[in-house]
Amino acid sequence: MLKNKVAVIYGAGGAVGSAVARAFAREGAKLFLTGRHRAPVETVAKEIDSASGRAETAEVDALDEQSVDRHLQSVIDKAGRIDISFNAVGIANTRLQGVPLVELKVEQFSLPIATYTRSYFLTARLAARRMVEKRSGVIMTVTSIPSRTGIPLMGGVAPAMSAVEALTRDLSAELAPQGIRVVGLRPQGMPDSGTIKEVFGLHAKAYGISWEQFQEMIASRTHGRRLTTLAEMANMAVFMASDGASAMTGTIVNLSLGSLDD
């Protein structure tokens, strides 16, 4: 589905980024994997290379405009174009969630909002400037269920996710006439992601239960009585990035297994 597509992935060393990288590689994409720390990204690239995929790595701070810009230009110099930009950056949730808003410091509240909106804006804007020349490309974002429904103890993460979804729609409104699609994924918490386990642990502690019990509680609210997996999210990302989804733009795909009505 993605044969010879050139894809840049931010946060490629994390659970979401690495899952998407493997899925893109399986479908024939040429990958340029990035992260703030090179070691975990190199691990993913080696795994892809060993499976006959194609992946190059770079240390890129997705909050640094010059760092992102230099890297994208290097991709253009090597591959000639950018077909897909997938941002999977994340920040540690310790002290950012699991605390009531009335007790949360303003710095803790503001951090995820500033971090996610800056990163998604920078990576999208700089990729779009290259994509416009070819009048084609796909920019992809990742959010979460709290962007659409009130959930206690989320701190500034929920407002950050809502902002990213608004940015996704606005980017699409401006870029679609120039051949660029902008789409987002909104998965339910994925228990095979280390980040989600950390988040579940923070919320479980506040409820006075184990993270396993908290996970069961969240899963019980879905139609399938289970949670989304990384593989399911990555498979959907493949379709959304492919030419088969050419009519899809300005939308956030709901991967909540029915726990959130559209």
Where do the PLM segments sit?
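Residue(s) in the substrate-gating loop at a strand-loop-helix junction
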Residues: S144
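Short, small/polar-rich loop/turn modules that mediate ligand/substrate recognition or access, typified
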Residues: A176, R181, M248-G250
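Conserved mid-core segment of classical short-chain dehydrogenase/reductases
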Residues: G90-S110, E133, L153-G156
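Active-site helix of classical SDR
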Residues: A124, A160-V164, T168
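Catalytic Tyr-X3-Lys loop
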Residues: V102-F121, S136, M140, V164
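Alpha-helical segment proximal to the catalytic Tyr-Lys
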Residues: R129, A173-E174, S246
